[in-house]
From Swiss-Prot:
It comes from Mus musculus. The modification N6-acetyllysine is found at K248. Expressed in testis and the CNS. The keyword Transferase applies. The lineage of its organism: Eukaryota, Metazoa, Chordata, Craniata, Vertebrata. Homodimer. May form a heterodimer with other members of the Deltex family. Interacts with NOTCH1. Residues 7-97, 98-174 form the WWE domain. Keywords: Acetylation, Cytoplasm, Metal-binding, Methylation, Notch signaling pathway, Nucleus, Repeat, Transferase, Ubl conjugation pathway, Zinc, Zinc-finger. The modification Omega-N-methylarginine is found at R255. Its main location: cytoplasm. PANTHER family: DELTEX-RELATED (PTHR12622). The gene is Dtx2. Belongs to the Deltex family. SUPFAM superfamilies: RING/U-box, WWE domain. The WWE domains are thought to mediate some protein-protein interaction, and are frequently found in ubiquitin ligases. This is Probable E3 ubiquitin-protein ligase DTX2.
Amino acid sequence: MAMAPSSSLPQVYPSHVVVAVWEWQDGLGIWHPYSATVCSFIEQHFVRQRGQHFGLGSLAHSIPLGQADPSLAPYIIDLPSWTQFRQNTGTMRSVRRHLFSQNSAPGQGIVWEWLGDDGSWVAYEARICDYLEQQVARGIQVVDLAPLGYNYTVNYATLTQTNKTSSFCRSVRRQVGPVYPVTSDIAVPRQMGLICFCQQCLHGSGTGPVSGRYRHSMTNLPAYPAPQAPHRTTTVSGAHQAFAPYNKPSLSGARSAPRLNTTNPWAAAPPVAGNQSLFHSSLSHLGPQLLPSGPSTSSGASASFPSGPSSSSPGSAPTTVPVQMPKASRVQQALAGMTSVLSAIGLPVCLSRAPRPTGPPASRPASKSHSSVKRLRKMSVKEGAPKPEPEQVIRKYTEELKVAPEEDCIICMEKLAVASGYSDMTDSKALGPMVVGRLTKCSHAFHLLCLLAMYCNGNKDGSLQCPSCKTIYGEKTGTQPWGKMEVFRFQMSLPGHEDCGTILIVYNIPHGIQGPEHPSPGKPFTARGFPRQCYLPDSPQGRKVLELLKVAWKRRLIFTVGTSSTTGETDTVVWNEIHHKTEMDRNVTGHGYPDPNYLQNVLAELAAQGVTEDCLEQQ
């Protein structure tokens, strides 16, 4: 039964006492909170085990949810991987931990729910519950959920939720129950030196967390055009302060081909507050297959959770989590010499040239608010433009050296004075195995045949990137699948940017088939958590970042297809090294506001991908 909210709910929560809410993510990217009782059980395990070194599948670090709620007997949470695992089906779901003030809705045991078509009540995610509670406490009877990425309004007077596009209504209610657990493990993120374990920071390469990646609010990221942005690589002394992206490997298959990195992505400390929030948006252009069953959609589909917690017969606690990462084949090992260099410094592993993007599916015409990004569906390479020959690209950006320097080629790991390690794998009439050259801007030296092999394993778009310092030659493009980017604006301010409104970016990428530039050409790929909502301040610098993100989207640089480092799922769409703010406030996870250095840092990340203000002048 719905109850009136407390009128004493403050607008800002000054208390340092916090409560923890654990949520799981369904296949459509929607987050669902566990009950307060289950959250208390999970939190006890989490606080007790933080700081320990986890082993994948260790019983000590697997939380059997059936011990807290018998209806959840098939489910366990594996803390090292931040994953909920269903034993009888093998389904894996991401989980996250959010911290709220003790004066918030979760801290008072308040849960808002909506009525599904099957007559069951479904809880909103905790952040929405808290937002609804704050707005109602201010005396707002009709609460618009647009700032959180939802196309709904909630009317407190009539206790209904209305789809703003279809006018379809559902009943809602406000319940008061047990409070969520108070936690002593706040772990407020520091400004510098803290490793980030989010999906954006854990690349789709399946190589685990980056040991030493800078935090989002890091203050000393190098400004463009400094090429040596710190990533997972380690600096070594030398004439050019080059980067050593991996230890010198043992030989397998082709000469000097490094072994593919198959590091366990779960063998690391978990994030403080889970993964980034991925909010649902039922914008009318989205196909019904991309819309979750709740909150309400125009089709009125029933709410269901096919792979999340559900009623089942009780079972015993598991002993292991049967998760297996794919093993590297000999072909992958041979390719690693060219591609692991790029993946190690935060670039997607590309196997061939990018496919020509296909036209978008039939949908309604874009409104005026959409028109500014509709053109981003097209690739930056003009239709029918001839692609240069690979040897021509290498010659264009290099100078041949008569005498090879006394150093290693970091692509094949052989001395520059001896033949290229790819001489038995790459055929070229124009470039011999002993030919050595240096890149014209950064002066780093390589076997030209190694550069050719690296280029041929990429998009072959006429651009080249130095594997040592990341200097870009030409216009770099990525492997992002086809999708849609839309931009909206609303008046609510972001914390730290109270003098302006907010820009909402909605990315939507559907499931599809991988092209020749992806890890498994011809096979399907998944796109979890779309549409994804991201936030920028509507300030001059925020608008500049927006325009550069449009360029990055056009060049297919924002997402790629790879292995999720949080769930281990292969052939799925993952972020590609350009960090986005997916939460509006409470910057506990590093993906919200306030963050005074975010705009400066994302400009540096865009510059590292070759997207600078000069690109705007060329448009």
